[in-house]
Amino acid sequence: MGQKIHPHGLRLGITSDWKTHWYADKDYANYVAEDIKIREYLEKGLDRAGIADVVIERTRDRVRVDIHTARPGIVIGRRGAEADRIRRELEKLTGKMVALNILEVKQVDANATLVAQSVAEQLVNRVAFRRAMRKAIQSAMRQPQVKGIKILLSGRLGGAEMSRTERYHEGRVPLHTLRAEIDYGTAEAHTTFGRIGIKVWIYKGDVVGGVRESELNAPAQGRGRGDRNGRPRRGGQRRQRAQQKQEG
């Protein structure tokens, strides 16, 4: 069962949350259709921005769209021009006030959707599929919160006449464990030989008592370039030695 079902759908309310937050009685079908149109518009219009996730929240007369992206500069544009254009288009699409919230994804190699998109870009650029898969797995396993990864490719791999499926994995990916935090993402590579489908599963530890193991293993925030208080300055030891010699 865990091998076939969508990992997010199986774990809704346990380790994963809904990607839309609203309630509707009579307009349920219209809201679902609007959500699909919003997601399709963002995926097609911002295909180079590395969109990892889109979360939609609705009130009576307002729609808030959270865009999780690896390249926020492309979404925002020069002086916010691109973000304003996207907001206007979404307002035309929904007929309501739209508030955009653009969030940057820090750990790109630990996000399943971004890993799948990266493999798809490499396949379009004629990189060997085994090399692309190996590179993605190595980059993901370097992240401290990643405990396992599985990548599956399906299609005319290497330009073969007959389509086939290839899979690589490293570490643990327990798809049957409900408390396991599994990140899942898909992408398509449009090559000269046809479409190649990419699926990625990333295991980031368990969720016990509402505490995510991935958050405990996440790397600490680094200091900024202007913060010099937490590190020794050059010549500090030489000054101390010179003072000791003068006192002696």
UniProtKB/Swiss-Prot annotation:
Residues 38-106 form the KH type-2 domain. One of its GO terms (molecular function) is mRNA binding. GO terms for biological process: translation. Residues 231-242 have a biased composition (Basic residues). NCBIfam families: rpsC_bact (TIGR01009). Part of the 30S ribosomal subunit. Forms a tight complex with proteins S10 and S14. Belongs to the universal ribosomal protein uS3 family. Binds the lower part of the 30S subunit head. Binds mRNA in the 70S ribosome, positioning it for translation. This is Small ribosomal subunit protein uS3. It comes from Corynebacterium aurimucosum (strain ATCC 700975 / DSM 44827 / CIP 107346 / CN-1) (Corynebacterium nigricans). The gene is rpsC.
